[in-house]
Amino acid sequence: MNSIHRDIFKAIHEGKWLKIEYLNKEGRHTNYWIGIRDLDPWNKTLKVDGLHLNRCSIAGYDKIYIDSILSTEIVEGSYCPENERLIEDIALHPERYQNLFANTANLKILNYLEMCSKLDATPYTTDYELVRYIDGDQVRDGEYQLSEEQFKEIVTNFQRRMNRGTQQGKTLHIQKLALNILSIHTKNGLYVLAYRNLNLDVKNKAFKPDEDITICTQFTIGGEQENIRRYLDADEYELLSDFEKNLEKIKDAITEKNGARAVVDDMPYVIGLGMDCALNLHEEYKAILDMYEKEQVTFPIRAFFGDLLERPRRTKAYPIALLNQNINLDQLLAINNAMKYPLAYIQGPPGTGKTNTILNTIVTAFFNNMTVLFASYNNVPINNVFEKLSSLTYKGKRVAFPVLRLGNQEKVKECICYINQLRREVHGIKVFSSTLDRRKGDRIDRAKQLSGRLKEYEEVLDLTERKETLTQVMEYQERMKNVATLFHFHTDLQGRQLRNLDEKIQKIGEISERDAMALLDRNEDEFYSYLYYTSAKYIKELESNRFQDLRKILDDDEDVNEQAAAFNKYLQKSENVKKLQKVFPIMITTCISSHKLGEPEPLFDMTIMDEASQCNVAVSLVPIIRGEKLMLVGDPQQLKPVILLDELTNRKLRRKYHVADEYDYRENSIYKTYLACDAVSDEILLRNHYRCNKKIIDFNNKKYYNSKLQVQSDSRERQPLVYVNVDGGPGDMKNTSPAEVEEIMRYAGENPDKSIAVITPFVNQRILIERGIKENGFEHVVCGTVHAFQGDEKDVVLFSTALSDRTGKGTYDWLKNNKELINVATSRAKDKLILLADGKELERLHQGNEDDDLYELVQYVKMNGESKITEKHISSRALGIQPFSTETEAAFMKNLTHALENIWLTRNKYTIHKEVAISQVFHD
């Protein structure tokens, strides 16, 4: 599908006008805006309303030939009535439109994600010149009629804005008109909480407000971000979900809580809003459609769209190279699968050696001459990996490991300095290629043996899971009535099938870590020698003639800003990226900055994404496009992506494009989407936990990880769980407990030798605690919400719940089953978890509710880890199949049992078929 067809598809579905350059019958080029009324796919013609841009006149055209359209661009901020019949016909009969819109299902998903990404930004008020044309009081009746002069001025303004947008390239600065519904006058400026978009109805020469209201839970004022949670308590936050119905309640709540500090304003005036989107995904996503057009789709992209129906069979065994011997079987299996297969999903619960697995995967890829793009949504995980790779040493000297840390302008400046530093360091190192790896043949032979053992280990895990499932099926059957009809089947399960599984497991035998480690190269000194000299060889390549153009950039440091700009320009070309990989085969950057690496095409052998469960779906595709293979590392039980797109807008976009649940931008991370869409690739669980005292992590293990974690930590703390009951008394402010702050300061003062983290779910409580830390001068104590501590660890964690007599049901409902918050907060503690709460208020809020994770955690800590923990239903391959705990699974078991009864009672022969087309099952 070319870009013209794609823009036509988008204009039809989004109800927008399209700017076109058209070759008319006389052979002249003319420029129009067109509003599409209908489409004839057979004759490839459009029925449109057209605005002639030179004359600014509007007329109807019944036959615009699509093949005569030379270029197109969506007119953002315009309104065209949607042809619902046409949209439905495209959805129901895509084959009719195949010559125009190939892969319509994929196109809908990409258009949806592109729109979500554009709108997932913090808005701000801006001096938009169109505001002066409109009086908000006149928009009350549904639209604002424009005079001929106003209309011409506005069309000219739209044209100028579109031209600027074309020149801006990959960065988007969106400006739009909006009709105020509710704003808050704060001391810093105007916070626009709710508005309706005003769109240009070109045909009627009027501005038309959206039917739907947009809610801004976050807004930028004077460069500082404001959040609605500052003006509404959690109890009242839910009122936003039905804004129109609850408008008066919202106004009253803001006024009651904030008084004169925040004055609400519901006057219907017109405002200019701006949004800065770091990346325009249009060209990135076009590359995906081009892959399908050319039939050169990579495995990761096929898996994303659910097109991977069979796991590729790979027989090659890759030698595994390790930086250290701190490795276990699960980590080895993760590395092996990442090397061997096009997709590998690694679930890394807290403290299971996720970073170590990534480091060894990167080094193994380097050892096997692979290129790697390592990315994540934020800087912390990629900085950690870069720091470790760039600080490797051999006999007291730094290993010039060929890795680049790229990113924004400052990171690029640092990168240039780093490259030049490496050039100087390797200058005097003599490298003899013949001695770099004398034992390569031995390594390959060992790799084959290790690959075989890991395959057996994977098979044992699979057989064990099957055995668990078989046991669960039998337990289900025993609970059924009329089980006599299934007696023979039940006996077969209990006897032959269960025995077969046991025999297979016994035949393979136990796969120990000692067996696997024996097949690894244990000569660490020799391997670091290899890394030292091989890395130097890579860096020395920079001095060859082929890099003369790059050296010119690296050596010209007169203006570091111009130098960085020149280096960025160099990296924009795919041929330069491929050339640079000969020196730096490993490149590290954020998901957003990945777009700076060449064109959107497969440039790397492998993309590795860390914290994939925190990466949003739309932007994550940018680094994924650039890799032939993909390794996603994350944990869906920890923090989710931070999404600003409001729920109402998301629902509207999903309806518009008929987007399935697995691609829901607000509800999914890239990790969750891939697991939902790829049914054939394995997910590996890193089961060995090394961080927390056993009693601390046991709560998380039983609650969130199906008791799959094996605790290997060496903490010997005798009292790892401490509950502090704090009588908070009447509070002056919601979501604060000064009494808990006092207890925290007392403990911190008595334990200056401990690294301490204080985690609280509430901003107001955090402010009080931070004030106390500053006043007491505690340098060993840090405080924050859970997002500040993802991936971190401390000797002691104090969890301040800050429940008080002013805490309402809505606030507690948000807190009690916030699994990401509770899981991350508790699993940061290595030796001691101290939980502070007002027991009286906790009992009041709990109200005997069975489903309450926070209450269970308090009881667990109170009883020193001896209380009962109810498991959360987790949809995860890596954590094993949950036994029929959903309606869908129960219905499946009921239908399966019914089918088996028929088979056993009728004694008919039967066969099992996989991947049967629905058309063969249901006949007309």
Model-identified regions with their sequence ranges:
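Helicase C-terminal subdomain and adjacent C-terminal extension
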Residues: 646-684, 701, 773-775, 808-913
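Conserved P-loop NTPase motor core of helicases/translocases
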Residues: 89-92, 96-102, 133, 288-298, ...
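Active-site metal-binding core of divalent-cation-utilizing nuclease and nuclease-like domains
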Residues: 28, 905-924
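A helicase ATPase "motif cassette" and its flanking acidic/Ser/Thr-rich regulatory loops
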Residues: 82-222, 490-491, 497-500, 509, ...
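Core beta-strand-centered patch of the WYL/Sm-like small regulatory domain
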Residues: 1-88
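ASCE P-loop NTPase helicase motor core
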Residues: 208-211, 215-252, 310-427, 565-705
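Conserved helicase/translocase motor-coupling segment
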Residues: 707-772
